[in-house]
């Protein structure tokens, strides 16, 4: 063992932290040894010769100068010109080169599903061993264990051959029609190396997602228009964002590196100026340091690696691919130089940096208010009343209301945005604003656009203004300036005279009114004429996209914009009007969803205006709005950007100067002419300069990608407006290249030059077409946004600008540094580099700054990435109608941070921020930095930025990596969307792509696995969700690109319909709350406890200590009583045995109708009087005695449907003294499942005979039943309709303590248990119910529930006979046939009291939600209902109950009357809402506290709040306490524990328990270990708490404005705390009975005001324990049910420590995979749990018992036995 005394202090600190983590079980032994070795490695003996040299980061750009290179400096040895400014200028034209071939290794997968899944990390702190070994070895930014270095021999070998082969390779390049050439070759090589580095490492075995055969057979391509078969035949569509459209990967990522070796010795800083060998080492070390700075030192802050899901083991997968030659760019110098303005940061020395503690308390306990204590001696020297007053005054006040709504999950936010202390910091000087050249307006340029059109329309009326091509490439129409002027005047005149009807009003359009322009993308001529018609009239046009259908979602957002702008008139063409969606009834234009009602005005075939009409009379103010352009933000919201007339004309002038436009020039436009660059150049600036524009529709570009180049050749065009997509498409059309000449082209404007991947498109296009006359200075990338217009533009010709005209720049940047917002140069052969080109210079008359993208707009440093802001006279003015967003975007004053020295020299130094000037800047939404000479570098956009775990990633970078993964043609080229979603306080990366139609499931899984590895290795970020959709399933923009916002919306909504989904929450989610640690006391107690407890408290503190603590603090002990059972008036005349009661009623009131059975139509099927029941019971007793040879005490199985036969058979058994067992008959359609349960109950109950009716007897002996149960093995079966030969002699005499019947039931955990109910318990229960519910013979009670067990059996069979009331029986299956049967019965018979089940409530709510009007027409009135009790053995379903009340409130239902009962196996009726009981009280508890077995009361609507409703009122004679299920100690008031019950009608014990070998003897004879230790209780097996609360609530459950109970009563104790305290002490000291306690007893003086409410939380056996916390399945299931409308039912359970969620899909199988991400997101967000498996099944698969409870364990068994026939099973990684 090493001696650690000589180690530095911080190392010893970290070793101590590791020892603590190991002792607490946070990490494994293997992880401990690995981290410990890593800490001690720098201090072990080091081999010599391994010193690694370090260099400061060199400057971040290389600028090339083709014309005046010798004026800037001297040429160094590498041919790079070193300038006096420290920048390097490359003197040769960039070119492409190939690199070494790489080979892949074979990947083996092993399917060990349960083992690997169980090892998936549930904690955010450390990964399990199965996942720990998946860390990528190359380029592991953020992981200190995997530093990125090169093997020295490989490094030198490559560098020595690089220069000699460079020019030879460049000359050997061929331009062929090989599509691979235009993929991201350098990125592809980086991906291949990253994957190769991972292939030899062990993989966790994870099963591949499984699909049902029908889903597999379904073709992924569902659309008829399958227009993307190949990339050559059908060109991939445009972009991902409607604003910033893109289509293919950037080819700008530099070369990869060889497999790394670990760093042995800490690097030492040295100067970077030295020999060439030193320079090579510097490049290498720079790469190392750029990857080391983000490395944290311990597991909690390290993101677990992205893991590879294995494939099924049917056959091993081979990934040996043929070698592919890769090409890489070699445009950059191998050397980089220090920048003079600042010293480079020492980012290699981070070992001495002390880190904050790894353990962050991620959960803040919500403490209860506690009483202040007084002196122990003084407490007994004053009277009780005075002491009570003193304690009341000293009691802490309730928490302030705002505190209930504070965000208590801030720890999750902190964990999601960890600050890496070793991250690079910007170290440059603060930037200064960069000024564009002075705007010089050419002589003779028209003053306004209207003047320009009038001039050219008059003087050059035959000159062509616009030409459009048809889909065949032929010129169809040419619009001259004369025609444009005359048509615009016609439109202006028509708009000034047209009267539009707006409701009853007649309105005309006035100057300044806003109108919509709706024109298709192939009709620019009509659009231009309408545009200038609006300009002449002074109207404000808003161009919008053509709505494709009335249900399209993007037009909904546009409709909101139209409404906010007050637009009522839309201009369109006749052809467009015919294509608009029509109403099916009237044939008129349909009302589009979300749109205002528009008046459509056709701008064609208008009359000629009169001669006196003069469009020049309108003199609009320059500050007035000229037009509105829509833009979309990251979330998909559409906003209108208002452009003033001054800004419009100033921008046109600036473009005229920057682009050198002159009159008569010809421009070819491939862009969208309705917005942004296409609008500014082809519609506005072209008219200002009198130019000719040729428009190429998108449909033609898809068919003939080279058509724009052919038009340039044919018309000798001088300018062309394209996107990098069009360059790429033109390169693919090699067969058309021979006739192309681009010598006339002086400007090729690349509109999306701000996309970093445009660099490769420009370089490749230039290299191919330079031989066709294309000049290198003609390619002009530009950056733009709707808010700023043109941000920057590279000038054409580069010769006549004001300053540094010839400079163009590009540089290789570290993506890892960019993720921290810092610019650092990376080596060319780095896996994680990004190559950028400049987007030109600042526009004329504009001034530009870069400010921080987050927080206040502080000026950035020169080496810091921020948001580009511009001030000029040519920017937008505002977002229409959005003042708040306008101020934050269009009125930005950049701040300059300065240090304020204290006046006395001794104080602290403060940082103050001052505005740099009076000017307001406009945010462009582009992220970048400024280079020398005003060069603008853009590396992303604000909308495309994803901040994951504190680091920023560009969606474009992720796309480039994904598209470089083999096989290259797996997904369609431009059909990919990358975005982030906010889940659990952090952004998660989602990748959606369209797959090829012919790929198999296994191929998809392989490709997705490689993508996960590649993105994790290169970007150091995990993909949260990777989904593949069928071809043409991603939403498109009007120009065919990906509509990113709509794709994101559909993904979150669950309407994207993917074909394959892979979720990786285990590796991506690192900010889960810290697992709860169970201390040794809890673990020991859990082992010793005989019951299946849930670890309620830390038993290191004994139960006696807990009780004394409660007493000392004055807290009540949780104990409650029902009222005493009084003597009824006719008690002396009525015997107490139920058989005697029936015989007595038959004698005293023989004709009294006691039971009425209704059929499905509501008609009376049968009635039963007291005498009829008595006689039939005697007959059946005689039958059993005669034919069945039944003796008193024998067991008889009764298998009957709900009805009167069951009643008669039950009393027949009691008459004979036999013990009946009621059993639900098997379902005819589901015999295989239900018949074995029936037979099991018959066998377990030891029934000697079966009594039933003829249809069920035939079913038991049928051929279908014989496949499950042999008919010959049944006990003797008797038909109840058989007639005995002689009458029964007399009723058997039985004792009160003998068994009356056995109550069998299957629990939700799959346990079959039968309890013994004695005659004494039966009579006591009936007496208690009669007293609570005020039942007597004249009452009518409607029952709609299952009569086989629990309180349902008691209400159906016993209480009617005991109380003599009229019971109206409705079988639940009759309600399924007629959902309104139950409610109509209540109304028809004026029933005041009714009992039902949750199944009936749910059926009525779902089936009758749309039938309220028809029910009103049938005069159904529910005002008569006084109590509606839902019989249940679970926590009350608050949401379902509230929905039922709210729905039928329209029929007069009083919402207060609906309540829930509570019973269990040990006592069928503990709580029932009585006839005169107050309304059930509700409280809101904190779900997070509940997970930790605590009750913390909060307010309605508070974060993590859960509404819990009181389960009825305690029945008379019932006493309830709350005890700790582990320690059996008495809990305090409002503390969570197990509900124990003491009542005369408790069951007498279990007859038998089948399916569980646990000892349950103490369930009926439990004793407390503290307090009244001699009393016996029955353990219910349910967790809950007691709370003293008010007896009535003034508001119903639905009243959202009334405070909850928590706001109106004490948080800690009752009003009688002191007297209760004394009484408790006396009870403890005497060890006696505390039945006479004032706590909730009938003797309490405040009994009319206060009562003890029983709140049931859930069954102990159902508690799911994950991460040390306890979850109740119903809470998780409620969250899942809310996440998607197609989820019909849901159930959760655990499997190998993984959470499994089973959801029933009520929809098409194609929608199954929509549920997987939503279920995962919802459970993660609401419960901080990671779902391990999502199973999508058909409706009806989740088993539900007769009480409406889910049989989760049966479902689990079916899942493990593969019996569910799932539609889809997703295994989350």
From Swiss-Prot:
Please state where this protein is localized: Cell membrane
Q: Where is this region: Disordered?
A: 112-185, 198-319
- Which residue windows does the record flag with biased composition (Polar residues)? 113-125, 146-165, 272-297
Tissue specificity: Expressed in the developing nervous system. Ubiquitously expressed in the developing brain. Within the mushroom body, a higher level is detected in the core of lobes and peduncle in the late third instar larva. Detected in whole mushroom body neuron structures at 48 hours after puparium formation and during later stages.
Provide ranges: composition bias, Acidic residues.
224-236
What happens when the protein's gene is inactivated? Mushroom body lobe defects including ectopic axon bifurcations and/or axon guidance defects. RNAi-mediated knockdown results in an increase in the number of mushroom body lobes as well as ectopic lobes and guidance defects.
One Pfam family, short name: DMAP_binding
Gene3D superfamilies from the UniProt entry? 3.30.300.30, N-terminal domain of ligase-like
Annotated Basic residues bias: 166-175
Instruction: Output the Gene Ontology cellular-component terms.
Output: plasma membrane
Q: Where is the DMAP1-binding domain?
A: 3-110
For this UniProt record, the keywords arranged alphabetically read as follows: Cell membrane, Developmental protein, Membrane, Neurogenesis, Phosphoprotein
| Mode of membrane association | Peripheral membrane protein
Bias regions of kind Basic and acidic residues — which residues? 176-185, 241-253
Q: Which residues carry this modification: Phosphotyrosine?
A: 60-61
Subunit structure, as described in the record: Interacts with Disco.
Q: Which family does it belong to?
A: Belongs to the DIP2 family.
Role played: Required for precise axonal bifurcation in mushroom body neurons by suppressing ectopic bifurcation and regulating the guidance of sister axons. May function by regulating expression of tdp1. Acts downstream of the serine/threonine-protein kinase Bsk to modulate the direction of axon projection. May play a role in fatty acid metabolism.
The protein in question is named Disco-interacting protein 2
